[in-house]
């Protein structure tokens, strides 16, 4: 019999869910099944090239003034794509035009603490907890009068999309999530992992210290580039590609949001009381009922779960795909064709 906690999760699954995906290094991959196809190979090199987005737009949404870009027709089916850390909207520089050319209205916002997104009030706490970022997405969709959308994301973005799919399924027509089910909670974040798994979270523990906070502030670009290299060890990106994104880390709230996010996961920083009810619901690891495709790169160097460990968290139509060819953590930018295809396929579910 498997040991279960108060929220109904097995102890093994609770261990795996540290923060957003801790402990995955210790979980062996399951054999591929018809629900777990291998796709690819794909390219693993990226140059910035001449491609760019249209002008960055700004809109007041909830507690933020959000910077975002769009592609495709204004009357197309809405697709909202969400980046992670330490990345930005340019993770979708190839995905957005691919989907736009197929008639989708693609919207890519900067998350709080990135790019041109700003807080409307200096008094608002610079809070990086998961439910705050999810509430940002709901407010952003409200501001753009998007009733529901296909949501896609990786890293922080996948977690945010998954939370909206779980708590507000009427706002999410379908979901594409890199690395699967990433909803976490502070209780899971307090559970110690075996040393090999803890080692993969070195930066989380570094951020728990004043030295880590100051070090990240001083060496934002160097830190981000190291994470890119570790998380995507086979991705060959040029300096222009990195610098294009690194400009987003100059946001005046970036460091506070990032540090609070990781400290909150470990229970070392408090959240805001306004999010307590949402966090209570998320702590129960709610199932995601909307149609979903999860993706994983075959060379993801960041902590991530084995697909077999989270398949039962998706109770609607579901498929997992492993993308071959040396694809790492930043899957939309490393494998844009496969990511865009997943969006189009899940739309038909």
PLM feature spans:
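Conserved acidic functional residues
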Residues: 84, 155, 333-334
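N-terminal secretory signal peptides
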Residues: 1-10, 35
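N-terminal export leaders
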Residues: 10-22, 27
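Catalytic histidine-centered segment of alpha/beta-hydrolase-like enzymes
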Residues: 327-335
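Conserved HGGG/HGGXW glycine-rich cap/lid loop of the alpha/beta-hydrolase fold
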Residues: 71-116
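C-terminal alpha-helix
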Residues: 342-349
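Signal peptide processing junction and immediate N-terminal pro/mature segment
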Residues: 31-41
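Flexible "cap/lid" subdomain of the alpha/beta-hydrolase fold that forms the substrate-access gate
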Residues: 41-55, 63-66, 71, 78, ...
